[in-house]
Each structure stands twice: as C-alpha cells, then as structure tokens.
Amino acid sequence: MTKSNGEDPRAGSRMERFQQGVRQRTLLAKKKVQNITKDDVKGFLKRNGFVLFTVIAVVVGSILGFSVRSYHMTFRELKYFSFPGELLMRMLQMLVLPLIVSSLVTGMAALDSKASGKMGLRAVVYYMTTTVIAVFIGIVIVIIVHPGKGTKEHMHREGKIEPVTAADAFLDLIRNMFPPNMVEACFKQFKTSYEKKIFKVTMPANETAVMTSVLNNVSEAMETLTKMREEMIPVPGAVNGVNALGLVVFSMCFGLVIGNMKEQGKALKDFFDSLNEAIMRLVAVIMWYAPIGILFLIAGKIAEMEDMGVVGGQLGMYTVTVIIGLLIHAVIVLPLLYFAVTRKNPWVFIGGILQALITALGTSSSSATLPITFKCLEENNKVDKRVTRFVLPVGATINMDGTALYEALAAIFIAQVNNYDLNFGQILTISITATAASIGAAGIPQAGLVTMVIVLTSVGLPTDDITLIIAVDWFLDRLRTTTNVLGDSLGAGIVEHLSRHELQSGDAEMGNSVIEENEMKKPYQLVSQENELEKPIDSETKM
C-alpha cells in the first residue's frame, strides 16, 4: 500500500527510526560527558600516558630540531645533541636478539606442527598479498603523478652506492637463512664482496692463425697467443649486524623440535618462556625512557639536514608521491583488509598500537620497534601470545610493505628522470623484483637503499642515480618503517582471527593433558602414603 501522493510509508518510518537513533546517541554522549569525573580522567591518562608522552615528544622534537638549525652546529655538536636518542636505539637493539629467539622458540613450541603449519601458511599468504598490493599502489601512483619531469642535471646528489649483482644478492639471502655459526650470526651477516682479478685468456683460432703467419719465431708466437683480461669476481665477505633471517629460521626449527619433544623438552620450553617474560619486563622499563629518546632522535635528524631547499622542487614532488602511496596503503588498504577478514573496527586495533607506530617513526627500524610492538599487541589489543611470538619476529624480518612500495615507486621515478620509457614487461620485472628485494631488506635503517640497487639492475637503470633520492630518504624511511610495523601488527590480528579454532583446540588439549597428569599423580601419591603408614616409627636403618 502507498499513500495518495505516491510516497512509500516505509521510507518515512525508516527516516524516523534513523533520526530517533541519532537523538538517542546524542543524549547518551551528553550524559557520558556530564558524568566524567576526575577518576575517569586519571584512568584515561594512566591507560594512555605513554602514547600521549610519545606524541608530545614527536611534536616537541620537530619544533626543537627546526629551532636549533639556525645555530649551524658542527658534526661533533650534533652527535652530542643526538646522544639521548642514540641511547634509546642501543637499548632497543640490545633486546632485539634475545626477543626474536625467545619469542619464536616459545611460540613454535606452544603449537603443534599442524597448527603452526596452518598459521605459517596464513601469515605467508597475508605477507605476499599485502606486499603485492603495496607494489601495485606504488607503480600506479608514480605513473599517474609522474614526479620525474625535467632533467636530473639540476638535482642534488648525495652519498655513494656500492655495486651489487642481483643474483649474488639473492644467493646471499639464502646463505643468511642457514648460518654456519650461530654465535657469529648474532653479530654478522654474510655479504658477497668483489675484488679485481686478472685472467690470461687464449686468443680465438682465427686470430691465432694470423698471428702465427706473421710471427716466425715459435716462442714469440706462444707468448702472444694469450692476452690479459680483468674481471670483478665475487668473494665471501661479511658485514656487521644481526643476521635476523638466520636466527628466525633456526629459532622456528628449534621451537618446533622442542614442541614435538613433549615432556622431554619442557625444561627448555620453560627456560625460553622465562627469558621472554624477563625481556618483556625490561621493555616495560625502557618504555618510560622512549619519549625522551624519540624527541632527540627526531630533533637531531632535523638539525642535521644540510639544505631544506632540496626537499622542494622535483624531489618535493617525489616525496609527496611516496607519502600519498604509503597513506593509501596504510590508511585505506590495510584497515579494509583487517575489517574484511575479522569484521572488527580496525581503528580501535590501530589505537592500541599507536605507541609502536610512533616509536617506528622515531627509530626508523622495525626490528628496534619490535619490543614495543609486542607489548602493545599483547597488553592493549589482547592478541594471543602464541600468535605474536610467531608472527611478529617473522614479519619484522620479511614483511616490508612500505619498503616494497617505495622501491617500485623510486625505480620508476629514476626511469622518468632519465627519460627512459618502460614497457609492460619491464614494469612487471620491477614489481616482481621489488617484492622479492623487500623480503631481503633486513629491519635496519635505510636497508631499502641497498636493495634498490637490485631493482634498478633488473631493468638496466643506472644505479648511481640512487644518490638523487638519498637527500629525502631519512624522512621517507621513517614513514615506510611505520607502514611496515602497521602491516605486521594488523597481520597478527588477522592471523589470530583465522587461527582461533586451532588456538581453542590447543587450549582444550592443554587442559586435558593437565587433568591427565594430575590423575596419573594421584595413584602414586596414594601408594606412597600407604607405604609411609607401613613404615616403623624408628626410621633408622638396622645393620
């Protein structure tokens, strides 16, 4: 039935219900505001104090950094000025090694092989999906905006790039997964270096025939039948830094073996559980110092910038393009993916990891941020420890959405600067190489610049042109690190949601095993009690 004027009465009732709902929510909000007490304010500040202090530290650090630029401090003065920030980095990096090992061992030991296999597969699928999406966003944005207009002659260059071969870089990645010495893996990574070697090469047959006809002396002919050739050959080398990939692989295998050992491996499992708990308590202490360290890290980096004008012009457009790409991925794609899988509010989840994101912005290292990320996810967002201990260390090592997006975008920007038209095949090569190279980028500051060489080499672009973008990389590195940490954290939430049935069944099995263990102890206790009753009062042994 409809009204005489043709209006649908249901539409009017829906509008009335909507208006009534809005009025009720408004009244409820007013009541909540009116009922706020001093205790509520204190409780809010207590719960979110760390986050507020960290946000204030970022703002104050930015203001302080721009304020002291006018003093033109020397390199030594800048080092002294940034010293509190350096202390924070050292404290966080101190905890990374034991945290990666203990968390992965305990996480893998707490799961059976079937559950850990399913969880690992879900994590890898998530990592690959988000990385491919990030690369796609970076390529589309840089093609649409086209920040590489103009010529590179007027652009500022900075730094020096070491040559590297793509094949050697990928082989190094695999070599680092299996370190020959676990102690050395704690402070060194394998890296192929190059040295010049001179070879004697035999001349081709047609050239030798001419030479022998010209030369009558046989000995002279034999000497001239060879010529010298120089070649850069790969030799084994090493660089300072934790081999995170090797430790991750070893810890996962070690934890899986301990879990399968059941009762025999309980002592080792308890040891790593205690170690993990001790590290997290140290993190709680360091978190009080984090705002001060972040303040001076940001202030020192801003004061260190040589020329603010470099950020303008062509590099300014490049910077804006990277920021737009990272924002689309971090603010739209990742939250949408989290909501689509879990049907939960992603912004509530992101609010719980806000301090980890700000720490990533300040430290520019996803590995250094790992202790804070653990604490935020487990305490604020109540993510299962078995998930965080498994997903976060692996994610901090191989899941680099921000880095993948940046590398694909920067490679095409360098092609545009050189007026180099890329065809579809070359763009596809860039996307595949950027995805693979981001896996090899360790969670250390400015690792993206190193792997960028691999991406440029894959399509024949000049690697020296990386020096064009180094001037703004310190800032963009912080943004892509924040994106990486956000991707790892949301990934932990998604994997936990998808693995909830395995986790619940694991809890049930653990409960049953405890009951069985108690039941097995009871007969023994009864027998021992009976034996004690049968013993004589005089317990001395008779000769």
Curated annotation (Swiss-Prot):
Annotated GO MF terms: glutamate:sodium symporter activity; high-affinity L-glutamate transmembrane transporter activity; metal ion binding; neutral L-amino acid transmembrane transporter activity
Binding site for Na(+) 1: 395, 399, 484, 488
Reactions catalysed: K(+)(in) + L-glutamate(out) + 3 Na(+)(out) + H(+)(out) = K(+)(out) + L-glutamate(in) + 3 Na(+)(in) + H(+)(in); K(+)(in) + L-aspartate(out) + 3 Na(+)(out) + H(+)(out) = K(+)(out) + L-aspartate(in) + 3 Na(+)(in) + H(+)(in); D-aspartate(out) + K(+)(in) + 3 Na(+)(out) + H(+)(out) = D-aspartate(in) + K(+)(out) + 3 Na(+)(in) + H(+)(in)
Tissue: Detected in retina (at protein level).
Pfam families listed in its UniProt record: SDF
Record field: compositional bias (Basic and acidic residues): 532-543
Highest taxon above the source species: Eukaryota
PROSITE patterns: NA_DICARBOXYL_SYMP_1, NA_DICARBOXYL_SYMP_2
Stretches assigned to the Extracellular side: 69-86, 146-237, 299-319, 414-426, 461-473
Intramembrane segments: 347-377, 427-460
Annotated L-aspartate binding sites: 364-366, 403, 444-448, 477, 484
Biological process annotations from GO: chloride transmembrane transport; D-aspartate import across plasma membrane; L-aspartate import across plasma membrane; L-glutamate import across plasma membrane; potassium ion transmembrane transport
UniProt region (Disordered), positions on chain: 521-543
TM annotation in the entry: 48-68, 87-108, 123-145, 238-261, 271-298, 320-341, 387-413, 474-495
Membrane topology: Multi-pass membrane protein
Subunit and interaction comment: Homotrimer.
This protein's domain notes: Contains eight transmembrane regions plus two helical hairpins that dip into the membrane. These helical hairpin structures play an important role in the transport process. The first enters the membrane from the cytoplasmic side, the second one from the extracellular side. During the transport cycle, the regions involved in amino acid transport, and especially the helical hairpins, move vertically by about 15-18 Angstroms, alternating between exposure to the aqueous phase and reinsertion in the lipid bilayer. In contrast, regions involved in trimerization do not move.
Primary role: Sodium-dependent, high-affinity amino acid transporter that mediates the uptake of L-glutamate and also L-aspartate and D-aspartate. Functions as a symporter that transports one amino acid molecule together with two or three Na(+) ions and one proton, in parallel with the counter-transport of one K(+) ion. Plays a redundant role in the rapid removal of released glutamate from the synaptic cleft, which is essential for terminating the postsynaptic action of glutamate.
Protein name: Excitatory amino acid transporter 1
Organism, scientific name: Ambystoma tigrinum (Eastern tiger salamander)
Species classification: Eukaryota, Metazoa, Chordata, Craniata, Vertebrata
Gene that encodes it: SLC1A3
